[in-house]
Regions:
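Conserved structural position within tetratricopeptide repeats
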Residues: 30-34, 68-75, 102-110, 153-160
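Residue-level recognition of tetratricopeptide repeat
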Residues: 14, 48, 55, 89, ...
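Alpha-helical segment of the N-proximal tetratricopeptide repeat
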Residues: 4-38, 48-61
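Canonical tetratricopeptide repeat
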Residues: 45-46, 86, 121
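TPR alpha-solenoid repeat register
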Residues: 42, 83, 116-118, 167-168
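Short coil turns that delineate tetratricopeptide repeat
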Residues: 37, 78, 112-113, 160-164
Length: 170
């Protein structure tokens, strides 16, 4: 029997992903990334499946390997806002906040029609993750302030509003 074509392998990996079998899909996309290394979607789905498999299903997928797969997808197809957004969200989930901020800002610059959504998503996800990760700072307003300030800066960007305008409304 002839070996499946790359298209068929991608379809099978997508089916596993659609069925919620992220471990199986991750394994398939990992193999596909080695077979067709110039396919941005394969790298993106490798990253996404690695993220879901490790996050929700406890698979042992290295954080750096997931980050590298997102970066490779972006390198191969740097016009996909969703690649930057997903990468940024993943970086937040692993407490790589500077990298996340950079990814969200690049995505917002690429597609101004989505900038408000991207900035507000970064602000909320960033703040929620910091509060969940460093719960003890919630009790101390001074410790919480720098994180709240950064989140607020991005919310104001999303609203296209200066701090002065916001103060006048409050």
């Amino acid at each position: 029997m002839a070996e499946a074509t790359p298209e068929k392998k991608i379809a099978n990996a997508m089916k596993a992903m659609d069925d919620g079998d992220f471990k199986k899909a991750y394994t398939a996309f990992k193999k596909l990334a080695a077979e067709i290394p110039d396919n941005a979607e394969v790298w993106y789905y490798k990253a996404e499946c690695g993220n879901y498999a490790s996050g929700m299903f406890g698979a042992k997928v290295d954080t750096q390997e997931i980050m590298d797969a997102y970066k490779k997808a972006i390198e191969l197809d740097g016009e996909r806002v969703d690649y930057y957004q997903s990468y940024g969200l993943f970086c937040i989930s692993v407490n790589k906040y500077d990298e996340a901020e950079k990814a969200y800002c690049e995505a917002a610059e690429m597609d101004e029609s989505m900038s408000a959504s991207l900035y507000s998503e970064f602000a909320i996800e960033y703040y929620n993750n910091v509060m969940a990760t460093y719960g003890e700072i919630m009790e101390d307003p001074k410790a919480r302030a720098p994180y709240g300030k950064k989140a607020l800066e991005y919310m104001l960007k999303a609203l296209d509003m200066t701090p002065e305008e916001a103060k006048s409304l409050l």
